[in-house]
């Protein structure tokens, strides 16, 4: 089984690659290695016979075509994307280039590759386009996003992902390319680049820096442990029906302030300090266009394909905090040289 994974040096991608290699799939990881791509996240699979790495930009059609022709994948799982909302506010160009144009390149290259396969291999081939619940916009106090929910993106990031979803759907409907789409809720877990909420709070707390909470901290997100997501992606690309969408969520809805408080309480327990970590919480100016609530209904994935999350938020966040406490070798170079925790996405100074 040969699987081409794009963005496999990123957070979700590296979790998927580690999982696929562990079940003896043959994996080609194609990654540009932007600031958020980190080969250190793949040390557990480095040098193994069933893992290969290709540094390439998904917008480079020549490189991507060569990857398809040389590796001859049975499945493609497309995760490569710019994903941080704050960065999209002040740097939308990169998001359009990678998330829209890059997805177009992947779809068109996959279509040409698939059309030239033998009938048996053609019937077996499938591509999974991995997306986000943010394409649906903001929910009120009730309800959950379903696969049929209308698209209503609020940020340049979510707009770029919505566009890429529409391209994937169009390539399936127009050309018959066997594409499946997944839309996930907020992921968390080990090897998470420290610009995102949970790793940023953990590492700022350990450095005794302020813990910046946007607005009042009342925005609600559904949290999905990254290894549960990796298992879901493998299941969807194998068993999902072309032309269908599958929402992937953890059924863990929490306000941002409650997430930060849980992290602080865990750090008080696992790495006690003279003062409580919660004293570092600081409320800051809200993000422009900050969606109030996301909630995923994963019933379709659970009932049709039999997926079930193994971690709830209590078990997953404990594993995550423990991992960061034990793995400074991974995150300290990032804090020192790549991103030290400064505020991103401000249109004007706070």
Curated annotation (Swiss-Prot):
Amino acids binding substrate: 132
According to its UniProt record, which reaction does this protein catalyse? dTDP-alpha-D-glucose = dTDP-4-dehydro-6-deoxy-alpha-D-glucose + H2O
Any single Pfam family the record assigns to this protein: GDP_Man_Dehyd
Protein name in UniProt: Probable dTDP-glucose 4,6-dehydratase
Q: Which InterPro entries match?
A: dTDP_Gluc_deHydtase, NAD(P)-bd_dom, NAD(P)-bd_dom_sf
Give the source lineage, highest ranks first: Bacteria, Pseudomonadati, Pseudomonadota, Alphaproteobacteria, Hyphomicrobiales
Q: What is its EC number?
A: 4.2.1.46
| Transmembrane helix recorded as keyword | no
Family per record: Belongs to the NAD(P)-dependent epimerase/dehydratase family. dTDP-glucose dehydratase subfamily.
Could you tell me the Gene Ontology terms of the biological process aspect for this record?
Answer: dTDP-rhamnose biosynthetic process
Molecular function via GO: dTDP-glucose 4,6-dehydratase activity
RNA-binding is among the record's keywords: no
UniProt-listed Gene3D superfamilies: NAD(P)-binding Rossmann-like Domain, UDP-galactose 4-epimerase, domain 1
Record organism: Sinorhizobium fredii (strain NBRC 101917 / NGR234)
Active site, renumbered: 133 (proton donor), 134 (proton acceptor), 157 (proton acceptor)
> Which NCBIfam families has this protein been placed in?
dTDP_gluc_dehyt
CDD domains linked to this entry: dTDP_GD_SDR_e
- Binding of NAD(+): at which residues? 7-13
